[in-house]
UniProtKB/Swiss-Prot annotation:
InterPro entries: FabA_FabZ, FabZ, HotDog_dom_sf. Involved in unsaturated fatty acids biosynthesis. Catalyzes the dehydration of short chain beta-hydroxyacyl-ACPs and long chain saturated and unsaturated beta-hydroxyacyl-ACPs. The active site is at H57. CDD domains: FabZ. Its EC number is 4.2.1.59. It is an enzyme of class 4 (lyase). The keyword Lyase applies. GO terms for biological process: fatty acid biosynthetic process; lipid A biosynthetic process. This is 3-hydroxyacyl-[acyl-carrier-protein] dehydratase FabZ. It catalyses: a (3R)-hydroxyacyl-[ACP] = a (2E)-enoyl-[ACP] + H2O. GO terms for molecular function: (3R)-hydroxyacyl-[acyl-carrier-protein] dehydratase activity. Keywords: Cytoplasm, Lipid A biosynthesis, Lipid biosynthesis, Lipid metabolism, Lyase. The gene is fabZ.
């Protein structure tokens, strides 16, 4: 596949659910686009007032929790790994292992479309390292480096 063709890969919600085990209310990525296997991807999260976390974070002032932005980046990275290694329907899991340098730059609120760009810093084996940046309308909302472990069941 050419580099230009690879850049057009995407994952809709059906494929995402075939790759990662997360479900409502903890499935935090709606679509993944611009997938370049083993390199990068962009996750999309459409933030709505219907998010269950807004009941308590915060009543009358709904703000999408920063830790869930980081989790959305991690889920985007897991989909990138799944597409890169053709893991749909194989029961593989990508476990979040650690996070470094997390910074939150702006509030994310209902109506925002969160774009999470994840880039592979190291991958291909059991342990993958990523750099993630989340933005809304081109404005940086959060950034972090994080690691994940790939677990593929035998059989």
């Amino acid at each position: 596949m050419t580099e230009a063709a690879e850049a057009t890969l995407s994952a809709d919600i059906q494929l995402i659910q075939r790759i990662i085990p997360h479900r409502y209310p903890f499935l935090l990525v709606d679509r993944v686009r611009d997938i370049v296997p083993n390199q990068s991807a962009v996750g999309i999260k459409c933030v709505t007032m219907n998010e269950p976390q807004f009941t308590g974070h915060f009543p009358g002032l709904p703000i999408f929790p920063g830790v869930q932005i980081i989790e959305a980046m991690a889920q985007t990275a897991a989909v990138l790994v799944g597409v890169s290694l053709d893991l749909a329907d194989k029961g593989a899991k990508v476990y979040f292992m650690g996070i470094d340098g997390a910074k939150f730059r702006r509030k994310v609120v209902p109506g925002d479309v969160l774009e999470m760009t994840v880039t592979v810093k190291r991958g291909g084996g059991k342990v993958w390292k990523f750099e993630g940046r989340a933005s809304v309308d081109g404005e940086l909302a959060a950034e972090a480096e994080f690691a994940a472990m790939l677990d593929i069941p035998k059989g």
